[in-house]
Amino acid sequence: MFAVIKTGGKQYRVAANDTLLIERIAGEVGEIVQIGNVLAVGEGENVTIGAPFVEGASVAAEVVEQGRGPKVIAFKKRRRQNSRRKRGHRQLLTTVRIAEILLDGAKPSKKVAAKPATSEEKAAEEKPAKAKKEAAEKGASPRETKAAPLFSAPEGEPDNLTVIKGIGPVAAGQLKEQGLTTFAQLAALSDEDIARIDEAMPFSTDQIKDWREQAKEVAK
């Protein structure tokens, strides 16, 4: 038996024991999630097409891994305005293993972790509520749960990082939030530091290394 499901704005043809990499859905590793958007089910020549979904059909899947995809660089350039901008993006992804295809409103043989998960949007909706709940339990506001910066900003006046080609006001503000405020700090970045920045911020490794070399020249 096979099914055609829709999740994360994409369609997949699945069968039992198939492993898929899909856009993020809520669930811990090892839990069973139920995907309710089934466009079609079939076995052999007998195929049922939904309108748009097959009534009572769903797919139970086990969460194998939660992670992120490779970084994709978006480069924008405006001609005659000397404007260039690079942004990095890593898509949140979930690896699932199809456990079973269910018909006529049947329930999964294993306990489902939560309500039927259809896309990454549900996970995004749960994150703010979870942060507020944890903050309330600790007697703190949601803003106080913000992660610590990657680096410790030195005392004194910060440098104007926008002097470095490729660092605009927005990028300079993002670097400042992570404790990077001077040319000396950028010039002293190690490859390990650059890897940490690449993981946590929307900048590529090559981009940060270029800033490091420019900062060395400016800091002389």
Swiss-Prot record:
The family this protein is said to belong to: Belongs to the bacterial ribosomal protein bL21 family.
Ranges for region Disordered: 109-158
Entry-linked NCBIfam families: L21 (TIGR00061), PRK12278.1-4 (NF008916)
Function (record text): This protein binds to 23S rRNA in the presence of protein L20.
Biased composition (Basic and acidic residues): 118-146
GO biological process, one term: translation
Domain of life: Bacteria
GO CC, any one term: ribosome
Keywords on record: Ribonucleoprotein, Ribosomal protein, RNA-binding, rRNA-binding
Quaternary structure annotation from Swiss-Prot or TrEMBL: Part of the 50S ribosomal subunit. Contacts protein L20.
Name of this chain's protein: Large ribosomal subunit protein bL21
A Pfam family annotated for this UniProt entry: Ribosomal_L21p
GO molecular function: rRNA binding; structural constituent of ribosome
Keyword Nucleotidyltransferase: no
